[in-house]
């Protein structure tokens, strides 16, 4: 199977498509694992090898569990007391990516490399992967037991300091924060998560190669409640819920690294009870459920009577009754209004979040499209040279700055040029004459959740779909941009009608957007029209299927070359969500490569202020 790669913006471009680089977030996980798509044949061969060696293994919800042959501890005899109880002796193989992870010896390698260690005799030239005992050094050396004053500062009614100490909380008096340890599936400490009592801000610190979870509850429990922040974790963990463990996600609703999945394998039921504090996080539970196996996942939709745990406690609602009302994420083929009633009420009470992420640079789009929503298909078209890529760069940058994980597939221009355009739009002016500022802005820009496919030029559909499916699973990508669709035609084994081929490609992206709940934006060229004629939905190249499948159709109209007073504007020609159609004027700022009137007005204000003084 051909593996697809992603690059780290502005820092490294890898031309070998088999490599994948994970972006380094501020306060987000930095994975040392070489991530790749799993070849099903490798996985089948690996399981066959285990059967031939009579090695016990178990197919879990997301991982294959087996004895680690790379771990030094496993070369020593295992006592009867350890059998079946010591999770540190287990290794995990992710069934989607093929990542081989041992949380005990911190070995992370590909399935191909791990397969060699299970072969007898060992192949010639075989080298044992480097093992290192995960050791995490805390950034907070002055930790103490929680004091009554610290407990009172949380503002949770009825909470005692003894309860906080019992769930593993520690107090850092100098910075006025509560501290919790994060552990992996082997119960090894790999990081820490802290809550500043002053502004209720949370921060996470992890070791460079691991990612852990905060779990409270007995090891024999098979049900768990997943929450997104420490306040909700404290509320539920101190309520003595006998049937469920309480799990705090490490990165709130931004991403769920695959290194966290082994620690959740033992649970047969997972209930998402999340606090949705931003529009882009509204569908996070469904996205995480796809990664964790939908069949074991349930969901508590936020309503006035079923809010987040800390809000429910403040309103004196019965937490156990709310927990009992959790509904399956995966619905049956046929349902009733009664089954959907709570979902509908939740959407009506949270309509702004349901509308999607609002653009800050393009307020007109907010009025017409209402927001950027996951699971939709958008088509952007316009004449050659009209600025489709430049506009889409700023359009996607606006969303990425608000936490929308974005994957760019630029087949027309190289990633270095695209990344340079995005950086210039981010800064607002060119950096070629201010090179001393580059490191500062590059470091700021690198914090954005942006990923790039390393494909360039014509590409067949299969490896591109493999790449975006991998990105949606590993990096929790919410927005995929393909620029442009015509570069994916004419290179497949299909030798039929080109319009039928394009329809097949569009159908594949439509299916992907719906199945994986990811917004897909396709940049397409229009068919050749007379310059004086306006483009319409029927001007999109190919058959009518493209615009029929799309939820949104955006057309850049450029009349500057055909009329003295001609203008350039973006036309919303189709809007399936709200039905509102209209236009947005496009005025281009060359310095910042920006079409945003907000940015341009701010720039004029800055230029005007010194002259007035």
Swiss-Prot record:
[2Fe-2S] cluster binds at residues 68, 71, 102, 105. Residues 1-25 form a transit peptide. Residues 351-602 form the SF4 helicase domain. Its main location: mitochondrion. It catalyses: ATP + H2O = ADP + phosphate + H(+); Couples ATP hydrolysis with the unwinding of duplex DNA at the replication fork by translocating in the 5'-3' direction. This creates two antiparallel DNA single strands (ssDNA). The leading ssDNA polymer is the template for DNA polymerase III holoenzyme which synthesizes a continuous strand. Changing residue 102 to A: Loss of ion and sulfide binding and increased protein instability, retains DNA binding. Changing residue 273 to A: No increase in mitochondrial DNA copy number. Mitochondrial helicase involved in mtDNA replication. Might have a role in mtDNA repair. Has DNA strand separation activity needed to form a processive replication fork for leading strand synthesis which is catalyzed by the formation of a replisome complex with POLG and mtSDB. Preferentially unwinds DNA substrates with pre-existing 5'-and 3'- single-stranded tails but is also active on a 5'- flap substrate. Can dissociate the invading strand of immobile or mobile D-loop DNA structures irrespective of the single strand polarity of the third strand. PANTHER family: T7-LIKE MITOCHONDRIAL DNA HELICASE, TWINKLE MTDNA HELICASE. This is Mitochondrial DNA helicase. The gene is mtDNA-helicase.
């Amino acid at each position: 199977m051909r593996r697809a790669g992603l690059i780290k913006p502005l820092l490294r471009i890898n031309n070998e498509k088999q490599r994948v680089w994970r972006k380094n977030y501020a306060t987000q996980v930095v994975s040392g694992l070489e991530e790749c798509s799993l070849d099903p044949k490798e996985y089948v061969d690996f399981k066959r090898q285990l059967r031939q060696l009579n090695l016990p293994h178990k197919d879990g919800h997301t991982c294959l569990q087996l004895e680690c042959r790379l771990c030094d501890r496993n070369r020593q005899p295992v006592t009867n007391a350890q059998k079946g109880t010591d999770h540190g002796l287990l290794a995990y193989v992710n069934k989607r990516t093929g990542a081989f992870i041992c949380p005990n010896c911190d070995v992370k390698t590909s399935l191909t490399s791990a397969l060699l260690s299970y072969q007898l005799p060992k192949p010639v030239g075989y080298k044992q992967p480097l093992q290192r005992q995960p050791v995490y050094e805390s950034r907070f050396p002055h930790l103490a037991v929680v004091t009554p004053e610290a407990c009172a500062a949380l503002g949770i009614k009825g909470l005692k300091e003894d309860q906080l100490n019992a769930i593993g909380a520690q107090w850092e008096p100098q910075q006025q924060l509560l501290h919790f340890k994060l552990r992996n599936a082997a119960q090894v400490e790999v990081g820490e998560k802290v809550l500043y009592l002053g502004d209720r801000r949370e921060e996470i610190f992890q070791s460079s190669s691991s990612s852990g979870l905060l779990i409270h509850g007995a090891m024999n429990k098979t049900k768990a409640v997943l929450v997104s922040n420490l306040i909700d974790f404290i509320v539920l963990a101190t309520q003595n819920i006998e049937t469920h463990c309480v799990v705090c996600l490490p990165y709130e609703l931004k991403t769920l690294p695959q290194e966290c999945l082994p620690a959740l394998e033992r649970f047969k039921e997972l209930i998402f009870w999340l606090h949705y504090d931003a529009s882009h996080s509204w569908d996070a539970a469904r996205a995480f459920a796809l990664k964790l196996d939908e069949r074991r996942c349930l969901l508590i939709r936020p309503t006035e009577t079923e809010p987040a745990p800390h809000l429910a406690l403040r309103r004196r609602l019965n937490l156990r009754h709310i927990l009992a009302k959790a509904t399956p994420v995966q619905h049956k083929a046929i349902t009733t209004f009664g089954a959907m009633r709570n979902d509908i009420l939740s959407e009506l009470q949270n309509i702004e979040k349901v509308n999607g992420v609002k653009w800050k640079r393009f307020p007109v789009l907010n009025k017409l499209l209402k927001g950027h929503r996951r699971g939709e298909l958008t088509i952007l078209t316009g004449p050659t040279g009209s600025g489709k890529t430049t506009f889409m760069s700023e359009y996607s940058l606006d969303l990425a700055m608000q936490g929308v994980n974005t994957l760019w597939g630029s087949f027309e221009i190289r990633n270095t040029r695209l990344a340079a355009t995005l950086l210039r739009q981010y800064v607002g002016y060119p950096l070629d004459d201010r090179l001393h500022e580059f490191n500062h802005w590059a470091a700021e820009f690198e914090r954005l959740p942006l990923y790039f496919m390393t494909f360039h030029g014509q590409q067949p559909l299969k490896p591109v779909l493999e790449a975006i499916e991998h990105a949606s699973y590993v990096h929790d990508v919410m927005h995929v941009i393909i620029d442009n669709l015509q570069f994916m035609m004419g290179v497949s084994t299909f030798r039929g009608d080109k319009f039928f081929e394009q329809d097949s490609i569009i159908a594949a992206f439509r299916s992907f957007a719906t199945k994986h709940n990811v917004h897909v934006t396709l940049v397409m060229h229009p068919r050749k029209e007379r310059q004086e004629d306006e483009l319409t939905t029927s001007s999109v190249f190919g058959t009518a299927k493209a615009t029929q499948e799309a939820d949104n159709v955006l057309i850049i109209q450029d009349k500057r070359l055909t009329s003295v007073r001609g203008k350039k504007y973006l036309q919303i020609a189709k809007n399936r969500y709200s039905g509102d159609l209209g236009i947005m004027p496009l005025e281009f700022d060359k310095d910042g490569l920006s079409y945003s009137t907000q940015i341009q007005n701010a720039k004029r204000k800055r230029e005007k202020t010194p002259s007035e003084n």
